[in-house]
Amino acid sequence: MIIVLSPAKSLDYDTPPRTKTHTLPDFIERSAELIDVLRKLSPAQIGTLMHISDPLAALNATRYADWSPEFTAENSKQAALAFDGDVYGGLDANSLAVDDLQFAQKHLRILSGLYGVLRPLDWMQPYRLEMGTRLANPRGKDLYAFWGDDVTLALNELFKQDDDAVLVNLASEEYFKVVRPKVLKARIVTPVFEDWKNGQYKIISFYAKRARGLMARYAIEHRITDPRKLKAFDVDGYAFAAADSDDERWVFRRKLT
């Protein structure tokens, strides 16, 4: 069983990493290709492409200029410790034990516009490049064309020793589109998190993102390798709604008082 998460736009490179243990991303050469494309853009072009403010565009232009194919403790941080958004508030990797992180290293992957796919302890240099960005590149019109089957094939490598290969999709729709189901040698299960609001259950973005991180942490702490055990997930008041779920879409619901 492998869990995939989306990355986060916000990053924390100020807090020192709680472990020195690290690995290197699998697709550094491919990332360098994208950096070459991004370095040709002015801050104004970056702002227009990514729909971000002038200060953010300038920051990311600097990040692309500073990016190096040589990853060091000075310019990099482990991915799961560097990402700092709603999902990662739920995951809270900084409070995971060392053996938890090692389990995550085997069973958790983070999809990335720049890096393709990351292990939790892969060193990562700061960047912003959302998977849905329409960045023309030598391989096509956008990042889905750039990554092609590569991310899916990398995931397939993880399933070679797995009798019942299951990919648990805790990523956003934008990011999961880089995974090609027809190429993937695994069954896909997508947990969906709904909250009660205005007389009905609905997906509320902030809560749903945090819940994805909470479920990833739950799987790590409980050493879950059989996805069926995820149905017992009950963190923060969520409960599996069997009647509204099917084999591929698992619904978890809660009512906040």
From Swiss-Prot:
UniProt-listed Pfam families: H2O2_YaaD (PF03883)
Transmembrane segments: none
Origin: domain of life: Bacteria
GO cellular component, as recorded: cytosol
GO BP annotations listed: response to hydroperoxide
Family: Belongs to the UPF0246 family.
NCBIfam families, per database record: PRK02101.1-1, PRK02101.1-3
Protein name: UPF0246 protein Rpic_2164
High-level lineage: Bacteria, Pseudomonadati, Pseudomonadota, Betaproteobacteria, Burkholderiales
